[in-house]
């Protein structure tokens, strides 16, 4: 949902939009809670409070001040990610298609012939990093830029087996227009750009697990982050290949040689980072035109020193000349060298051309070896061709996508490779490598071993759920790692499936109860964003490829109502209750009935079950932003710091009742996942609370009334406010609690309206208005380690007779309390108090 804050109402009516007027009788937290549970996507918030907006944003719900109709229209017509700390809106708005344009944030693409393959009459527009060049389009009170681009389509095309770009583009745009927005993927770059600077400000040693190409620019400013990926393809791996011949397959209709060079350089930079943890100088031989340097410099400042007879417009220092073997001594330490020398073929006969290429390959290798032989902190990426060749067995082979699959590939060499064993590789094996293997990641670091690292902060986004990892090892890592942000795929199946298909692999699935954590927050993508200064206008879908975000060692753990909080906890319930359910009271009725409480009078105001826990369980797919286990645990240890809102402290038994209701709901819905989740949450409640039951009680608390509006034949009709199992020396403690609660007990507004047979030969009257006081009393006794209440549901009633009677219905009648007493069962009254 998105909350757009206005000082004045607007005449225009928008679809899926609701107006909320700030309620001055409630504080900012309660207003935020009420807003978060509204069911429309767009909320126009009038007479707004800035503090309420802040509360919503910290909860991950995008809430933006709007000063004009232009701002309102821009935000209401699309989704966005909001940097609420810096007041920047990142739109995810594809309405630019109506200008017959596609967009890119990569400059090199604009220098290709891609426009020849666009839809008829369409153009390509460069919008800069995260759309920053579009800021001039929006003269708003907040900074605004449109981060939507079509780079995902272009990159997917490059890695696909399809050649017809126009058809591919058309199909993908039609898909985009007919499917829900992949909001998490679109906002992820904004998130990473906030996440890693904030982590690096606090933690010196950071590990990042499983980065992919979409993060290739994110980490350029963080050379000390240790990356782990799927490892490199090295020369010794070619032993498994059978020899093949030249294929000559075209990969892309437009020229992507620039993209290939950029990927080679970025791969080399990250390889260097993992060895030396600092930024290198980048030397390039055969550099022209390297328009992609502009893209890298948009993200991070590097020194590019280049050699080529042709211009290299974006290099820092350019030598418009050839580079020879004798020039190697010009290259300094702490650098990477990219050798991309290849003479243009022009009209040369292919046999003659082949000789030239092989000579240049040998020359390129000689330059690489000479460069690496002296000095320190050096890495080289060198262009090679398929030919009979000796290479170090540990050399890293690269084959990033290029316009045509021909004879070209690259190798990354470091100072250790050149002193390692070399292996002779025949030309046909290199062709087999070129023809069959495409390097699909600029991160070629070794795989991560699933072991905790006490001195490091571990980030693993979308990296550990794959079933080639041991599920238990993933759980152990998360349980043991003190400082981390790790995601795992949430089990949002209905059959409690332990793993699910994703593309061509399988992912393990997880529930919050799979982990045993303290000082950790388990939330959704939205909830995680709120913890790092961002909010989002569209929540994750309840089904599909969604993840739990587990933040270990966060200083926000005890800020229960600020982050990963109960905002939107009832939103799904409201959507159901006020649309398709039998009555808007359905949830209240079901919760009482499923716990054998048949007095439904006032069920919506006096419910016997925690609605928070019940909704968090049965609708967990919609509201797992709320960290239920953390909420339960902090209540159990009495460390709930609440800044505002209408706070009600649940008795532990209310939480148990909620689990029982959720369990019955799951059985009726055939939802095996909720069934397990409810069972495990109940187990967790029993683990963190020391709940004891007076199932064999020896004392009870009774309430005597001035008068009863029914006939009775018991000596003194009374309401049993609860039973206890105590030793006689604990009577004083019980009396102390009753005295503390005296005012509240006598203020309890108890009423009755009918009689019924509670069981055979037990005729009783109902008593409404009791439960809230009962649960408060329960909490007081619990904190004082006094066993109070039974394991079965407490049903307030007034015993009238021990024989069968006809039921009676009367107008609801208020009962005046005469006295409250503590009596031994089948014994004497040991304490009595009157108002």
UniProtKB/Swiss-Prot annotation:
Q: Where is this region: 2'-O-methyltransferase activity?
A: 246-428
Q: Which reaction does it catalyse?
A: a 5'-end diphospho-ribonucleoside in mRNA + GTP + H(+) = a 5'-end (5'-triphosphoguanosine)-ribonucleoside in mRNA + diphosphate; a 5'-end (5'-triphosphoguanosine)-ribonucleoside in mRNA + S-adenosyl-L-methionine = a 5'-end (N(7)-methyl 5'-triphosphoguanosine)-ribonucleoside in mRNA + S-adenosyl-L-homocysteine; 5'-triphosphoadenylyl-(2'->5')-adenylyl-(2'->5')-adenosine + 2 H2O = 2 AMP + ATP + 2 H(+)
Molecular function (GO) terms for this protein are: GTP binding; hydrolase activity; mRNA 5'-cap (guanine-N7-)-methyltransferase activity; mRNA guanylyltransferase activity; RNA binding
The active site annotation covers 718 (for 2'-5'-phosphodiesterase activity), 720 (for 2'-5'-phosphodiesterase activity), 797 (for 2'-5'-phosphodiesterase activity), 799 (for 2'-5'-phosphodiesterase activity)
EC number in record: 3.1.4.-, 2.7.7.50, 2.1.1.56
Any one Pfam family here would be Rotavirus_VP3
* Residue segments, region GTase/RTPase activity: 556-692
- Matching CDD domains, A to Z? capping_2-OMTase_Rotavirus
Q: What is its main location?
A: virion
UniProt free text on domains? Contains a bipartite N7-methyltransferase domain, a 2'-O-methyltransferase domain and a GTase/RTPase domain. The C-terminus contains a phosphodiesterase domain that degrades the 5'-triphosphorylated, 2'-5' linked adenylate oligomers produced by the host cell in response to IFN stimulation.
Q: What does this protein do?
A: Multifunctional enzyme involved in mRNA capping. Catalyzes the formation of the 5' cap structure on the viral plus-strand transcripts. Specifically binds to GTP and displays guanylyltransferase and methyltransferase activities. Has affinity for ssRNA but not for dsRNA. Capping activity is non-specific and caps RNAs that initiate with either a G or an A residue. Together with VP1 polymerase, forms a VP1-VP3 complex positioned near the channels situated at each of the five-fold vertices of the core.
Q: What's the name of the protein?
A: Protein VP3
Organism whose genome encodes this protein: Rotavirus A (isolate RVA/Human/United States/WI61/1983/G9P1A[8]) (RV-A)
């Amino acid at each position: 949902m998105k909350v757009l804050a206005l000082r004045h109402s607007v005449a225009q009516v928008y679809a899926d939009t609701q107006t909320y007027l700030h309620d001055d009788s409630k504080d900012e937290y309660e207003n935020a809670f009420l807003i978060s549970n509204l069911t429309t996507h767009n909320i126009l918030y009038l007479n707004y409070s800035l503090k309420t907006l802040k509360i919503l944003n910290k909860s991950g719900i995008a809430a933006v001040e709007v000063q004009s109709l232009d701002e309102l229209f821009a935000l209401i017509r699309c989704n966005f990610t909001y940097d609420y700390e810096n007041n920047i809106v990142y739109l995810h708005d594809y309405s630019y298609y109506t200008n017959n344009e596609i967009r890119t944030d990569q400059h090199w693409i604009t220098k290709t012939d891609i426009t020849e393959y666009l839809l008829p009459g369409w153009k390509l527009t460069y919008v800069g990093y995260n759309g920053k060049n579009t800021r001039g389009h929006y003269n708003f009170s907040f900074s605004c830029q449109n981060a939507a681009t079509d780079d995902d389509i272009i990159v997917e095309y490059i890695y696909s087996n399809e050649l017809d770009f126009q058809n591919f583009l058309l199909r993908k745009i039609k898909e985009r227009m007919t499917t829900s927005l992949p909001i998490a993927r679109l906002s992820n770059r904004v998130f990473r750009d906030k996440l890693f600077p904030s982590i690096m400000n606090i933690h010196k040693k950071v590990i990042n697990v499983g980065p992919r190409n979409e993060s290739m620019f994110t980490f350029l400013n963080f050379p000390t982050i240790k990356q782990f990926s799927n490892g490199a393809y090295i020369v010794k791996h070619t032993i498994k290949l059978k020899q093949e011949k030249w294929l000559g397959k075209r990969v892309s209709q437009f020229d992507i040689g620039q993209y290939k060079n950029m990927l080679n350089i970025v791969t080399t930079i990250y390889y260097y980072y993992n060895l030396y943890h600092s930024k290198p100088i980048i030397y390039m031989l055969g550099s022209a035109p390297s328009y992609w340097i502009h893209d890298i410099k948009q993200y991070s400042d590097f020194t590019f020193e280049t050699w080529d007879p042709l211009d290299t417009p974006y290099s820092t220092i350019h030598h418009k000349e050839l580079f020879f073997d004798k020039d190697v001594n010009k290259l300094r330490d702490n650098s990477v060298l990219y050798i991309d020398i290849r003479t243009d073929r022009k009209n040369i006969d292919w046999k003659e051309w082949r000789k030239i290429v092989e000579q240049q390959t040998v020359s390129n290798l000689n330059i690489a070896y000479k460069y690496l032989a002296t000095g320190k902190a050096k890495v080289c990426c060198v262009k090679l061709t398929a030919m009979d060749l000796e290479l170090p067995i540990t050399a890293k082979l690269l084959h990033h996508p290029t316009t045509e699959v021909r004879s070209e590939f690259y190798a990354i060499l470091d100072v250790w490779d050149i002193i390692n064993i070399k292996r002779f590789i025949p030309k046909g094996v290199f062709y087999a490598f070129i023809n069959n293997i495409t390097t699909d990641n600029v991160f070629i670091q070794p795989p991560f071993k699933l072991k905790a690292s006490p001195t490091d902060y571990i980030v693993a986004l979308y990296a550990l759920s794959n079933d080639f990892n041991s599920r238990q090892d993933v759980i152990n890592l998360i349980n043991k790692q003190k400082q981390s942000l790790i995601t795992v795929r949430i089990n949002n199946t209905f059959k409690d499936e332990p793993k699910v298909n994703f593309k061509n692999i399988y992912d393990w699935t997880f529930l919050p109860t799979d982990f045993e954590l303290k000082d950790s927050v388990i939330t959704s993508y939205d909830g995680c964003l709120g913890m790092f200064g961002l909010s989002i206008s569209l929540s994750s879908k309840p089904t599909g490829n969604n993840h739990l975000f587990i933040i270990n060692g966060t200083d926000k753990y005890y800020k229960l109502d600020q982050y990963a909080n109960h905002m939107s906890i009832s939103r799904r319930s409201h959507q159901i209750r006020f649309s398709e359910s039998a009555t808007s009271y359905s949830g209240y009725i079901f919760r009482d009935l499923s716990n054998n409480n048949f007095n439904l009078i006032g069920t919506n105001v006096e419910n016997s079950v925690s609605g928070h826990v019940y909704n968090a369980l049965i609708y967990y797919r919609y509201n797992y932003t709320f960290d239920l286990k953390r909420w339960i645990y902090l209540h159990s240890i009495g460390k709930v710091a609440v800044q505002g809102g209408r706070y009600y402290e649940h008795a532990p038994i209310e939480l148990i009742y909620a689990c029982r209701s959720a369990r019955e709901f799951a059985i009726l819905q055939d939802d095996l996942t909720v069934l397990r989740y409810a069972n495990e949450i109940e187990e967790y409640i029993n683990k963190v609370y020391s709940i004891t039951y007076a199932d064999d009680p020896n004392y009870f608390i009774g309430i005597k009334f001035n008068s009863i509006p029914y006939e009775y034949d018991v000596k003194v009709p009374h309401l049993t406010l609860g039973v206890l199992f105590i030793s006689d020396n604990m009577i004083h403690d019980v009396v102390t609690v009753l005295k503390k609660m005296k005012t509240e007990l006598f203020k309890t507004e108890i009423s009755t309206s009918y009689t019924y047979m509670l069981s055979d030969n037990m005729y009783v009257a109902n008593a409404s208005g009791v439960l809230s006081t009962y649960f408060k009393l329960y909490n007081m006794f619990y904190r004082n380690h006094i066993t109070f209440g039974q394991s079965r549901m407490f049903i307030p009633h007034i015993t009238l007779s021990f024989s069968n009677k006809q039921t009676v219905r009367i107008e609801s009648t208020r009962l005046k309390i005469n006295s409250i007493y503590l009596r031994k069962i089948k014994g004497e009254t040991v304490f009595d108090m009157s108002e």
